[in-house]
Amino acid sequence: DNRKIKANYRGFYNVYNILAAYAAARTAGLELKNYNKVLADYNPQNGRMEHFRIKNTDVLLNLAKNPAGFNQNISAVQEDDKPKDIIVLINDRDQDGIDISWLWDVDFDRFQDMNAASITVSGIRCQDMRLRLKYVDIPSILEGDVEKAIRDRVEDGVGNLYVLVNYTALFSTRNILKKLEGER
C-alpha cells in the first residue's frame, strides 16, 4: 500500500519484525493509520537494544543466544559509526546450554571493522570468549566481575557502550545497569 514506515531501532532483524507485524495487522483488517506512532512510542525491553543512560554514557543492552542472533548484534553495532566500547558476557548455565562451541560460529572478526575503542569480556566463560577473540586477532580486556566491567567502561570509556549478553547474563546485567542508571 506504499506506506512509509519509520522506526528508530537498530538492527536489520528489527525490519523483519516490524514488517511482519504490519503485514499481520493488515491481513487481520486492523486500522493502521497510527502504526508509525505506535512504533515511535514503543520502548524495547528486556535486552532488545534496551537503552540506559549512566552518567555521560549511552548504554545499549542486547541479547544474543546463538550464532545467528550474535551476528545480527554485530551488524547492529556496526551500524553505529561513532567510537564505542563493547562488553561481551557469556555464561554457560543450563538455560544457556553448557556447550559454548557455538561461539566459534559467530563472525567475531567483524569487530575489527568497527570503531571499537575497547572490547571487554566477562561472565562465567570470559576466558573462552577471550580465547575466541584471540583467534581472530582481536585484543580484549578480561574482567570477570560484570559490574566492574561496566563501571570501568562508563568511567573510562568513550561514552557509547554496547553490552552483548547471552540468556542467563541478561537479567543480572540488566539489574546492574538499572542500578547504575539510578546512581547520581
Regions found by a protein language model. Name each.
Residues 1-70:
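Adenine nucleotide phosphate-binding catalytic loops in nucleotide-utilizing enzymes
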Residues 4, 95-97, 171-176:
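Short, surface-exposed beta-strand/loop "edge" segments at domain boundaries and coil↔beta transitions
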Residues 17, 21, 119, 163:
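Residue-level signal for inorganic ion chemistry
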Residues 28-31, 79-83, 153-160:
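Glycine-rich phosphate-binding loop signature in dinucleotide/nucleotide-binding domains
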Residues 63-142, 180-183:
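Active-site beta-alpha connecting loops in nucleotide-dependent enzymes
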Residues 127-135, 139-184:
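Generic C-terminus detector
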